[in-house]
Structure formats: structure tokens, C-alpha cells
């Protein structure tokens, strides 16, 4: 269960970074 939670946390961080990258791209262009 701990491993699954860690995987979920990693996915959440990746999604957040992807969102920040998209927001920055929209703001720049």
C-alpha cells in the first residue's frame, strides 16, 4: 500500500509540473 501511495504521489507531482509548464507556455506565447 505504501508503494502504491508513493507511485500516486509521483504521478501527482508530474501532473503538477506538466500543468505549470503548460501555464508558462500559455503565458509566454
UniProtKB/Swiss-Prot annotation:
Xref: InterPro entries: SclA/B
Matches recorded under Pfam families: Sarcolamban
Tissue: Strongly expressed in embryonic and larval somatic muscles and postembryonic heart.
Knockout-associated phenotype: SclA and SclB double mutants show arrhythmic cardiac contractions and correspondingly, cardiac cells show irregular action potentials (APs), involving 'double' and occasionally failed APs. Calcium transients in these mutants show higher amplitudes and steeper decay than those in wild type flies.
Any one of the GO BP annotations: regulation of cardiac muscle contraction
Keyword line: Membrane, Sarcoplasmic reticulum, Transmembrane, Transmembrane helix
Keyword hit for DNA-binding: no
Domain of life the protein comes from: Eukaryota
Membrane-crossing segments per the record: 7-27
Membrane topology label: Single-pass membrane protein
Extra remark: This protein is produced by a bicistronic gene which also produces the SclA protein from a non-overlapping reading frame.
Subunit structure: Interacts with SERCA.
Protein name per UniProt: Sarcolamban B
Native source species: Drosophila melanogaster (Fruit fly)
GN (gene name): SclB
Amino acid at each position: 500500500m505504501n508503494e502504491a501511495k508513493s507511485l500516486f504521489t509521483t504521478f501527482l507531482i508530474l501532473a503538477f509540473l506538466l500543468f505549470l509548464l503548460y501555464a508558462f507556455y500559455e503565458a509566454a506565447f
